[in-house]
Amino acid sequence: MHTLKKFIHYYGPYKAVFFLDLICATIISLVDLAYPQILRTCTNTLFTKSSSSILSALLPIAAGLLIMYLIQSLCKYYVSYQGHMMGAYMERDMRQQLFDHYEKLSFSYYDQNNSGQMMSKLVSDLFDIAEFAHHGPENLFISVIKIIGSFIFLFLINWKLAIPLLFLVFCMFAFSMSQNRRMQSTFMENRKKIGDVNSRLQDTLAGIRVVQSFANEDVEKEKFRKSNHNFLLSKDANYKCMGSFMGYNLFFQGMMYLVTLVFGGYLIAKGEMQATDLAMYALYIGIFISPIQILVELTEMIQKGFSGFKRFLAVMETEPEIQDSPDAKPLKDVRGLVSFEDVSFHYSDDDTLVLSNVSFQIPAGKSITLAGPSGSGKTTICSLLPRFYDVSSGRITIDGKDIRDLTLESLRNQIGIVQQDVYLFCGTIKENIAYGKPNASMDEIVDAARKANIHDFIESLPDGYDTFVGERGTRLSGGQKQRISIARVFLKNPPILILDEATSALDNESERWIQQSLEVLAKNRTTITIAHRLSTIQGADEILVIADNGIAERGTHEELIEKNGIYAHYLRA
């Protein structure tokens, strides 16, 4: 019931279209129900009269039928066009809501869910939901009207023959209800398996260069074959269930024709029914069978739609772990004093501490470098400052304000991040630089590119700033992508900077250019740097050596070398 209420809520903005759609569906059904009755009346009364009476009545009857079918055609046009558009609008609304919610979800959600499943919910599930949103109520409404209307006329024609038919219908619906739960579980499994196929496909295509460089095409083919075959198995269970459902329902429909012919013939033999009425019965059975077939097919659509909607709701009802507190305030006039006070952290699904009682302070405009072995928690420290994750205990402040008391948007607007793994969006160089400030002028973009030492390279390209970078920036070298990402941060112009191993994967020439850019970028900004190379480390105002138990050593490069501890050993290694 909760799911149904949530689903009905999405019809709200389109109530007028929805109800007009149902009115048109009613008219379509009534016209179909009216024709056998008109034919019966003509057969039993008009066609028993003289030829002149018949001929004089045909023109008015034809005109009436013409008007009736014109109205039905217009209603069908509305249902087919506006009804489908209503479903499309609802699909758009849900897709936008789902995308917006994905944008709000915390890093922890993405740590635990794969993008292929998320894409499946955004595309495949919502298509099935939209189809059901339109066809579900409409087909159900039409079918119910035709079934009830047909039975009313069947009872009026001969109630004795209608009773066994009604019994068969109850048997059919009882069987259908018993199959519903089984069908729903197979459709849910089917949705999960197509999500797995999407995940495998996306993973392989995103890493196609690695696949081909290792000549591992056969390995990936086998992985995909397994995912694809598992999807086939889920479809097999799905269609087996549907096959038994359709087969039994078709059997019940055949029984209706059998009962109509045999029991109807018996009633004619007993003089309790006219042969012409049996012909009308056959017409109404035809009208009656059609909506039953539609309802049978609708069952599959309902199961697909509701399975998809449940997966949609599961995401929409997932609350982001990181949210603004009720009284959160915007962060303004930032000087850049950053303090970590007894900070401990573990991931939500693991009680093992990644950081334990870490404390340090960075004066405004100063820099620290985090050094230490991989896995010691350096990147975690950098992820806690913009609240990608929340501390498990302790607190982090900026200018004395606990970051949990600040709005996420204002907090992250004051922090610029340059990462080792640069992500460029599929678009132009200009669009990627402007990501740091979406409303930036062309002059501002060019100025940021100059500061990042990438302007001359961009100008050397045939299309300049309008050069298409390819998916994830595949048309550019690592150094070029890194400088574009630095230009992005120059444009953002934040008072606090995080440099996460920004030069560790580059050649010496690229590193030299980028190091110059980073030095300009870091000037007068509070900067946290994660680095392995000596040239990057030694220029910091303070170096923190992070080990398994937190901060093992701290001091300037010279002080730590003189101490001859972990840091000195780390540099010699």
Spans of model-derived segments:
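ABC-type nucleotide-binding domain
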Residues: 331-573
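Transmembrane helix-loop-helix hairpins at lipid-water interfaces of multipass membrane proteins
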Residues: 18-75, 155-160, 271-275
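Juxtamembrane helix-loop junctions of ABC transporter transmembrane domains
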Residues: 23-24, 31-44, 68-115, 119-123, ...
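A short amphipathic helical element positioned immediately N-terminal to and/or at the very start
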Residues: 1-15, 118
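Conserved catalytic Walker-motif region of ABC-type ATPase nucleotide-binding domains
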Residues: 102, 224, 312, 340-342
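An intracellular "coupling" helix at the cytosolic face of ABC transporter transmembrane type-1 domains
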Residues: 16, 107-108, 124-133, 137, ...
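Helix-loop-helix
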Residues: 48-50, 54, 153-167, 241-310, ...
